[in-house]
Amino acid sequence: MFNRTVRDRFEVIEPHIRDRRVLDVGCVDARPARQQSSSRIGHKPDMLFRRIVAVNPQTVGVDVDEEGVKALAAMGYSVICADAQTMDLGRRFDTIVAGEIIEHLENPGLFLRNAARHLDGGGTLIVSTPNPFYQGQTWKIWRYGRPEVHEDHTNWQDPTTLTALLRRCGFEIADGCWVQPRKSLFKTWKRLLRPYFSYAFVVVARWKGA
């Protein structure tokens, strides 16, 4: 596990969304508070939710961003405005995708347990999140004395902490890999210090409940 690196997290996601009941959590994507969701969505054709829907048109999206949800609904997407930590959608799914959302939440454990309640037994939860030890962050700390942190982030996860939290919440880990979307500026570091300096990582977990 975590012995391979992909360029695009969608390489991991796509096999788990074909011909399945899929929920995409955080479908609007994060945004700076000063930027309107509707404007940003209109200029972001490659957003994860759209890529998922292109593979599985029956996908349901959920997000707490009311403006963004309204914008997606106006485009014809099946979306719901709800808090992923406390939502009760009244239905279950085969796959839940949580792409770059867990680091925005006040209570990651509450979210994982609630995700489990929305999965059928043996269902799949896919979580991707930025890597706190990304080589670019190391450079920024060295150069500027601090890392670059999104204004809406509340926590950091690494593969060890996230897999431990998933297990505590009743999941078993099925797969994990690193995400490095562009060529590294620190090729020597990467060779010597392994992929732990990659940009992000993805964990695929199975719900063990009924």
Predicted segments, located by residue:
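A short beta-strand submotif of the Rossmann-like class I SAM-dependent methyltransferase core
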Residues: 98-101
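Conserved alpha-helix/loop element of class I SAM-dependent methyltransferases that forms part
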Residues: 3-20, 43-48
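Conserved SAM-binding strand-loop segment of SAM-dependent methyltransferases
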Residues: 75-86
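Conserved SAM-binding motif I beta-strand of class I
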Residues: 58-63
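S-adenosyl-L-methionine-dependent methyltransferase catalytic module, highlighting the catalytic core
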Residues: 4-7, 27, 31-35, 40, ...
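Class I SAM-dependent methyltransferase core
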Residues: 24
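A short acidic, Gly/Pro-enriched loop at the edge of an enzyme's catalytic core
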Residues: 85-96
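SAM cofactor-binding core of SAM-dependent methyltransferases
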Residues: 32-54
